[in-house]
Amino acid sequence: MKHILVVEDDSFLNKMLSYNLTADGYEITSVLNARTAAEALRSREFDLVLLDINLPDGNGYDLCKLIKPEHPDTIVIFLTAND
């Protein structure tokens, strides 16, 4: 089963993404901030990371810079609600 990390600080959007992806058969780990995302990435491998750009304790770009050297095969898709 493919495992997806959802990193989104908007709790409603986080829950909706997680719900729909779970319904489609994916294993989901969902977190609300960059610190918890970094901890999750240290504990296991993910096939995909859905990554919010604006997080309360950092930004998705910086987190992606940490992800790719350690997990080069992990796909990262950025999410944002910015205009």
Predicted regions and their residues:
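Conserved acidic carboxylate
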Residues: 8, 55
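Two-component/phosphorelay signaling modules centered on CheY-like receiver
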Residues: 11-29, 69
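Short hydrophobic/Thr-rich beta-strand motif most characteristic of the beta2 strand and flanking loop
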Residues: 25-34, 40
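Acidic catalytic/metal-coordinating carboxylates
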Residues: 33, 59-62
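Short amphipathic alpha-helix used as the core "switch/output" element in two-component signaling
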Residues: 39, 61-72
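His-Asp phosphorelay/catalytic-motif detector in bacterial-type signaling
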Residues: 45-47, 71-75
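Active-site residues of response regulator receiver
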Residues: 52, 80
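Short, conserved "switch-loop" micro-motifs in signal-transduction and mechanochemical regulators
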Residues: 70, 82-83
